[in-house]
A protein has these predicted regions:
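Acidic, His/Gly-rich catalytic cores of divalent-metal-dependent hydrolytic chemistry
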Residues: 2, 6-30, 44, 186-282
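Residues at the starts of beta-strands that form the adenosine-phosphate
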Residues: 48, 78-80, 107, 237, ...
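N-terminal active-site segment of His-dependent metallophosphoesterases
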Residues: 2-98
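Short amphipathic alpha-helical segments
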Residues: 63-64, 95-96, 123-124, 179-180, ...
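Active-site environment of divalent metal-dependent phosphoester hydrolases
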Residues: 56-60, 89-92, 115-120, 174-175, ...
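Active-site neighborhood of phospho(di)ester-bond hydrolases with catalytic His/Asp-centered motifs
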Residues: 52-53, 81-85, 110-114, 168, ...
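Beta-strand-turn-beta hairpins that frame and shape the catalytic cleft
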Residues: 43-50, 159-166, 235
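Active-site neighborhood of divalent metal-dependent phosphoester bond hydrolases
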Residues: 76-78, 90-200
Length: 282
């Protein structure tokens, strides 16, 4: 009851400061569809499907990757491109990446990554206070009903039953139903540790416990990003595609349907855009 009353008071304050629609968006950045389901009718529109690792605002490398993906293809729109999250942040052209996905939603979709969430939070803070860190000043150019709403609606998972695959940014806890997975785990986890009660819990640290993907036993094959330190990961039931393009390494993608199924495509980073050894605030 107290929480409900507090939420009501907070909503009332924001409705005074902002329009009711803006207040709703600021207070609720959970997407309308948390777990997006690609039905067979949608999938049958495409001849190929490829899943792309973390782009992190590296627009030029992303375009080079698309050139390789589309090479020799009569109709690039027949290839569904799915990003494993972290479209933006850290790289030099986050707005360009964001707008590309916004303009090509018929054949380019993405799950939400932790850095997408960080920028959602930063934008909300900017709208509320007018304050923004210099490194995030590009967010000032975004629109509430356009860019922000697109980010806000990024789902946490994309599931393709026809292919028995699921895309998530960070990972899933084994033996926990999809509906009971914690939102923060799906965008931040890397490993699994056992607590004192022999219950497995998620951790974002990869120096304790074991990589969650190494113990994942299905039923879906999971494609994920987030874990650039481990680079390309290929396990029986999970494939990690974050190969650290923003850190000067590669941008990697894998075909999961069509004549090139199983093939990896990658491009080298044009330079190191972010030093992984230099600690920065989110």
């Amino acid at each position: 009851m107290v929480k409900m009353m507090l939420a009501s008071v907070i909503r009332r304050i924001y409705s005074i400061l902002f329009s009711s629609r803006t207040a709703d968006k600021i207070l609720n950045n959970i997407p309308s569809i948390v777990h997006y389901h690609c039905d067979d009718e949608f999938i049958e529109k495409f001849e190929e499907i490829i899943i792309i690792g973390d782009i992190h605002g590296c627009y030029d490398e992303f375009q080079l990757l698309l050139e390789r993906i589309h090479q020799g293809v009569d109709n690039p729109k027949k290839i569904l491109k799915i990003c494993a999250g972290d479209l933006i942040n850290k790289g030099p052209k986050s707005k360009e990446v964001l707008e590309y996905f916004m303009k090509n939603q018929d054949d380019c979709i993405s799950v939400r990554g932790n850095h997408d969430q960080v920028m959602i939070n930063e934008y909300i803070n900017y709208i509320k206070t007018g304050d923004i860190a210099e490194k995030n000043s590009w967010l000032k150019e975004l629109t509430l009903d356009g860019h922000f709403e697109f980010l806000r609606q990024l789902p946490y998972t994309i599931r393709i039953p026809k292919l028995n695959i699921l895309i998530v940014h960070a990972g899933l806890l084994p033996d926990v139903s999809l509906e009971n997975q914690q939102l923060v785990d799906m965008i931040e986890m890397r490993n699994i540790v056992e607590n004192g009660d022999n219950v497995r819990v998620a951790t974002k640290h990869n120096d304790e416990g074991v990589a969650w993907a190494s113990v994942w036993q299905g039923p879906w094959h999971i494609y994920f990003g987030h874990d650039a330190r481990r680079k390309l990961q290929e396990h029986p039931y999970a494939t990690g595609l974050d190969t650290g393009v923003v850190y000067g390494n590669e941008l990697t993608a894998k075909f999961v349907m069509g004549p090139r199924k199983g093939h990896l495509v990658s491009v080298k980073a044009l330079q190191m855009w972010n030093d992984p050894n230099k600690k920065t605030k989110k």
